[in-house]
Amino acid sequence: SVEERRLVAETVVRHAAGRVPVFVHVGAWNLRDTVELAKHAAEIGADGIAVVTPAFFSVRDQGLVDYFTTVAKSVPQDFPVYLYAIPQCAVNDISPKAAEECSRLCPNIVGIKYSYPDMTRIQQMLRINGGQFSVLVGPDHLFAAVSAMGGDGVVSGNAQIIPAYYKKIWQLLQEKNYEEAA
């Protein structure tokens, strides 16, 4: 429920206590709940939000742009918003053109978590805003490759279980030791 999600977000932000950035996923089954969760995340001191595409019914690019910009405009202009595409689960994919339009219309839309293993599309996302659009991947096996191409990392469930492994990969990537990182 929205109330449960609000409570989880409050608990995480409180316990993180500024030690690590907290981005709250606010995507919901409808725009009203998504906007409510986005505003709540900003109010409780989260560092930003991620918003998944609408699920179930297919939406054209303009519908996605309208959806994401509505959410982004509901929070302060300096509050970072990440788009989140996982088309294999949520039906809708975000085209690079739509992502770039979202970022143009709302400068607080700063990046995307792209969770589909389409390297061509990821390369296109990396070129948005002259390469200043943050690109995170979801599939763990793309972490090193996309980071080597200029991506900003991975959002990984596995990293919660074996963080030392992912920290080591990140350190190797920062050292540009791509062979060992892979």
Please describe what each predicted stretch is:
Residues 1-91:
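Active-site beta->alpha loop and helix N-cap motifs at the rims of alpha/beta catalytic domains
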Residues 73-79, 86-182:
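Catalytic alpha/beta core domains of metabolic enzymes, predominantly
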